[in-house]
Amino acid sequence: MLEEECPVFGKKLLEWYLNNSPLLDRKWRHDRDPFRIVITEILLIRTRREAVERIYDEFFFRFKSPDDILNATEEELRKAIYTLGMRKRTELLRKAAEYLKLHGIRSPSDIEELPGAGEYVKNILKLRLFNAGSVAVDRNGARVLFRYFYGYVPEVEKPEKRKEIAEIKEKCLDLYEDKLTLSYALMDLGYYVCKPRKPECGRCPLKDTCKYAKDTP
């Protein structure tokens, strides 16, 4: 079933993303500096991307290296990111900076040891830094996948960890060559269109073949 549905899903999703990418784009997606890439993904954990965008330039003007983060006072670091929320974010930033300083990231396996990095962060970092690994599925992407292929979203804390997502990745998503673009397309569709409440099915490129859209008045 997945194998039959996958080509249509991927084609429509990627077409939508490529047609809309100028409007969806974020400046950090063009970064090539490993330090900035890793730290940005820490900043993005459990917060809205617009909040990160508002502090992005000022943050990296102040913190240009792991040492800049490690040498900053707790007050300086908190002040720089307080609008993002999450109490432990300063701790995660320091641990990531320390890891980058002491070990660096020279291969995908190094990312596995990065403190504070969950499955999604590890996957997106492997793709961005090495073009390696699996498609990165965050909560937004997981919501798209569940609604499209199963017609519902499970009421669990981390749907991206469900076995159904692993099956979709294995039999569908990871067959695509450009996994980074597919990752961005998934998360953007979930963020802007396939929202947690009141998804905008009418303007979704997948609506004609989506199980959730078909069953929703």
Predicted features along the sequence, with ranges:
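N-terminal polyanion-binding entry modules of DNA glycosylases/AP lyases
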Residues: 1-111, 174-175, 192-193, 197-217
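Short, polar/flexible loop-turn hinges at active-site or ligand-entry regions and domain interfaces
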Residues: 24-28, 132, 151-156
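A broadly conserved sequence feature marking short terminus-proximal activation segments
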Residues: 137-193
